[in-house]
């Protein structure tokens, strides 16, 4: 069996060799396909081979888009070869990181302007509060109410003092009544009997004692600080009035209303002033104050 197989294999190899030799002789007998007189074609450029070599892993992006981590097929950057440089893409603008400002140090122009405005308001409020004596309010609403009340009192005081230059008592009375209505009942001494006076218009003993203490207090405050004196008079429901004006008003109201007002005045010595005035009581709605008169000469 082995000899038979060996002989069969040898015959098959010989037949193949004969077929190969016949094929080679047939090909050599064929005429050439090109003209040998023509020059050989130029070799391909080396850049093409270089680009193909660099772009060899490019098809892998289509087979494994998730593993490559590159851009999608629809984007221009994904279709662009990796070995070339893009000349049409816009420059990437990097956003500046936002820095959070520390407390009290704003960086926004609007915030800075608002902070400066609040600081100016606080400074003006402090200066305005210093003009009003004996202020003890801390919140802005209460402080503004107190300042408004004090300014109204000063306006009333100025109007009353300006009446000393008026001529007749007949014209002073209606003006003073108008001031009483404007001040909300602060100057009601001419429209209601004063507490502490008897039926004859004379002051009682307790009224005289309170009169003296009030006069001394007002005179001392006027020597130290005029603003504090005004604040004290405002709290007591009093208002400074020249003696001549009080006398004229008293005479006018005595003849017209039957002696409803009887001013009481006393002189208080002061070295630095020659002003003579009387403090006329203005009873409040809550409690009626005694008729107090004070003068500063």
Curated annotation (Swiss-Prot):
GO molecular function: DNA-binding transcription factor activity; protein dimerization activity; transcription cis-regulatory region binding
Pfam families in UniProt: HLH (PF00010)
Keywords carried by this UniProt record: DNA-binding, Nucleus, Transcription, Transcription regulation
Region (Basic motif): 105-118
SUPFAM superfamilies linked: HLH, helix-loop-helix DNA-binding domain (SSF47459)
Localization in the cell: Nucleus
Gene deletion effect: No visible phenotype under normal growth conditions. The triple mutant lrl1, lrl2 and lrl3 exhibit very short root hairs.
InterPro entries in UniProt: bHLH_dom (IPR011598), HLH_DNA-bd_sf (IPR036638), IND-like (IPR045843)
Gene Ontology cellular component terms for the protein in this record: nucleus
Induction (free text): Repressed by heat treatment.
KW Transport (keyword) present: no
Region (Disordered): 59-109
Protein name (database record): Transcription factor LRL3
């Amino acid at each position: 069996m082995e000899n038979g197989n060996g002989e069969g294999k040898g015959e098959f190899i010989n037949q193949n060799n004969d077929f190969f030799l016949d094929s080679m002789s047939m090909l050599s007998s064929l005429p050439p396909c090109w003209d040998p007189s023509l020059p050989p074609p130029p070799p391909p450029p080396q850049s093409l081979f270089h680009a193909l070599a660099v772009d060899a892993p490019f098809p892998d992006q289509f087979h494994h888009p998730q593993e490559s981590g590159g851009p999608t097929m629809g984007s221009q950057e994904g279709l662009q070869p990796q070995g070339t440089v893009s000349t049409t893409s816009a420059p990437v603008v990097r956003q500046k990181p936002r820095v959070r400002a520390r407390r009290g140090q704003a960086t926004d122009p609007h915030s800075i302007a608002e902070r400066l405005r609040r600081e100016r308001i606080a400074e003006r409020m402090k200066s305005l509060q210093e003009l009003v004596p004996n202020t003890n309010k801390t919140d802005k609403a209460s402080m503004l109410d107190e300042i408004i009340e004090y300014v109204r009192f000063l306006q009333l005081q100025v109007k009353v003092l300006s009446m000393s230059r008026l001529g007749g008592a007949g014209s002073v009375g209606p003006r003073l009544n108008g001031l009483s209505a404007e001040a909300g009942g602060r100057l009601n001494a001419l429209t209601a009997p004063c507490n502490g006076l008897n039926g004859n218009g004379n002051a009682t003993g307790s009224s005289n004692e309170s009169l003296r203490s009030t006069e001394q207090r007002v005179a001392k405050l006027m020597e130290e600080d005029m603003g504090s004196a005004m604040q004290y008079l405002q709290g007591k429901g009093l208002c400074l009035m020249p003696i001549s004006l009080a006398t004229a008003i008293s005479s006018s109201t005595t003849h017209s209303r039957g002696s409803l007002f009887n001013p009481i005045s006393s002189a208080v010595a002061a070295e630095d002033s020659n002003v003579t005035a009387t403090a006329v009581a203005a009873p409040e709605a809550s409690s009626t104050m005694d008729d107090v008169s004070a003068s500063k000469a």
